[in-house]
Structure formats: structure tokens, C-alpha cells
Design a protein with these regions (language model features):
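Enzyme catalytic cores with a strong preference for nitrogen-chemistry domains
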Residues: 1-298, 302-308
């Protein structure tokens, strides 16, 4: 099976634009021979959608756009995994899940909901989402796959000295027979993040002896910056496919021979910080719809960065 890692730059709340973006990437993936294209966490709503999730009309429109995306992508003959939200249907607890949806043949055929909801640092997901209590592997092509959402795959007891959560979704899915891990993410950037991710997921790949497909969001959404830097690994924890940093990208990997396309020209830490800040400023202006800006230069380091 050929899997396309679709590293997209979603705009929070722009359901129509985000759906069109994913359809365009799905078309590119199909033309490149992919059987499956994987998008980041909450790629339909944009991340983080925050209080938009409290609007019933937004939830209605999200489901409508998801169904339309499934129908529009049907002629491409490529399966899609994308991030969305799902109503729980329960009168108790939070009303929605953070979900990964599988689209095939014009229909939504499977949903996996996020189990581990971060509430530290920049995250406040437990304010909006209900945690999933169960999960199951699914058959994608000729592979039994584990589908996880960001934090779900960041809790390997073999790596962390002290874990934030008692459950390990990856361990549970591997025990249930999953032979490949697909992880969709909206993982913000900080200095050293690429090396940290690689180390964590290499340990997970070796621990469970499974290849990993890790797809991350790219772009700036208000104060959060996402570097992308998506990758695929073999069971030895070696990177076999990799996407660019700080820009949209589409790369393919093959589960049969565990090969893929690589982007190895990554910036050093200093250049990465500059690219992250430039991307964040550029996206803030573009996504807010500003036609022009006034730059005030006072002579400090902030002014120097703005001028650069």
C-alpha cells in the first residue's frame, strides 16, 4: 500500500477552504499513485478551533463538509484519513469528540476518537472534548492499522520515566493486532522539537516492532506555530520518508518495501526559529485577511525581527 503524507496548512474555522485544500492534496496523492492519503489532526476545522466548538451551527457545517469531501473525493479512488469532530450523542459529558475519519468510496466508513486529551502548556482540549473510552484497529488495504490522534501516541511507557496518563492507546492497539501505526497530529513547534519527535517515535517503532506514519500540521494559527516535518519510520525506528519544515508538502511511502520520499535539507536551530517566526507572521496576516500592515520600528530586538 502506498500512503501519502499530506502536510497541510489549515485555517481555523474555514471549513470550505480546508475541505478544498484536502481535496486538492487528495487529487495530487491519487495522481502520484497513492492508495491512502493522511491529513493532520482537526484538518477540517483547523487547530485549535476553541470556542467555535460551542456553536451548534459550526458542528452542523463541519459534518456537512466532511460528507461533501467524501463524496467529492470518491472519483479519485483513494482513501482519506482526516481530522474532524464528532458529536458524542450522549446527554452526559462534553458533547463532541476529537476524531479521525476514514473516507472511502464516497462514504465515512470509520471514526476513531481521541483518548488522551492534553491540558498542559498551550493545550486545553479537555475543556471541549470528551475522551474516547474504546478503540479498535482497522483494515486499510492489506494492513491492519492503528489510528491514533496526537497525544494518544505520546505515552509510551518504554520512553517516559513518568507518564501523564495510565492508558497507552498504542500498546492497546498493538496488542489487538495492529501492524502499522498511523498518527495524525497538530504538534506545535519549539526549539529541538524535530529531534524530540524523532527520538520518541523511533522508540515506539522499536518497542512495538511496527512502521509508523506521522503526519503533522504546518502553519501559524494565532500564537501557535506548527512546523510540519511529517515522517514515516520502519520498525527499526529509521526514517524512510520525510516532509519539509514550515511549508506544505506531500510525500509518499510504501508499506510493502518500507521505502519513501525524503526531504533531508532541514534548517539548523537558529534558521528554524527564524523560519517559524516568519511563517507565523505571514500566516497571521493572510488568515486574518489583512491587505496591508503598518510596521513600527523602535530599535529593539522585536523591531529587528519584524524588519527582517
Amino acid at each position: 500500500m502506498k500512503i501519502a503524507l499530506a502536510q497541510t496548512n489549515s485555517t481555523v474555522g474555514d471549513l470550505c477552504g480546508n475541505a478544498k485544500l484536502m481535496l486538492a492534496f487528495a487529487r495530487r496523492a491519487a495522481e502520484a499513485g497513492a492508495n491512502l492519503v493522511v491529513f493532520p489532526e482537526l484538518s477540517l476545522t483547523g487547530y485549535p478551533p476553541r470556542d467555535l466548538l460551542e456553536k451548534e451551527s459550526f458542528l452542523d457545517r463541519t459534518e456537512q463538509h466532511l460528507e461533501r469531501l467524501a463524496a467529492d473525493a470518491a472519483p479519485l479512488n483513494v482513501s482519506i484519513i482526516c481530522g474532524t469532530v464528532t458529536r458524542t450523542g450522549s446527554p452526559a459529558g462534553h458533547p463532541i469528540y476529537n476524531s479521525a475519519a476514514v473516507l472511502q468510496g464516497g462514504r465515512i466508513v470509520f471514526r476513531q476518537h481521541k483518548m488522551l486529551l492534553p491540558t498542559y502548556d498551550v493545550f486545553d482540549e479537555a475543556r471541549y472534548f470528551e475522551p474516547a473510552t474504546k478503540q479498535s484497529p482497522l483494515a486499510l488495504g492489506n494492513a491492519v492499522s492503528a489510528l491514533t490522534i496526537c497525544e494518544d501516541a505520546w505515552n509510551d511507557k518504554q520512553y517516559w520515566e513518568r507518564r501523564r496518563y495510565s492508558r497507552d492507546p498504542v500498546e492497546e492497539l498493538a496488542s489487538a493486532g495492529a501492524r502499522i501505526l498511523i498518527s495524525i497530529n497538530a504538534s506545535p513547534y519549539h526549539m529541538g522539537k524535530r529531534a524530540q519527535r524523532t527520538e520518541i517515535f523511533a522508540a515506539t517503532a522499536r518497542h512495538f516492532r511496527v512502521p509508523i506514519v506521522y503526519v503533522n500540521q504546518v502553519g501559524g494559527n494565532d500564537q501557535l506555530l506548527f512546523d510540519g516535518t511529517s515522517f514515516a519510520m520502519n520498525p527499526e525506528g529509521e526514517v524512510i520518508a520525510s516532509a519539509a519544515s514550515f511549508e506544505e508538502d506531500l510525500v509518499l511511502m510504501d508499506t510493502k518495501d518500507l521505502t519513501g520520499e525524503r526531504h533531508d535539507n532541514y534548517p539548523d536551530e537558529c534558521d528554524a526559529v527564524y523560519q517559524a517566526l516568519a511563517m507565523g507572521t505571514r500566516d497571521y496576516i493572510r488568515k486574518c485577511g489583512f491587505a496591508r500592515v503598518i510596521i513600527g520600528l523602535s530599535g529593539g530586538i522585536d523591531s529587528a525581527l519584524t524588519a527582517a
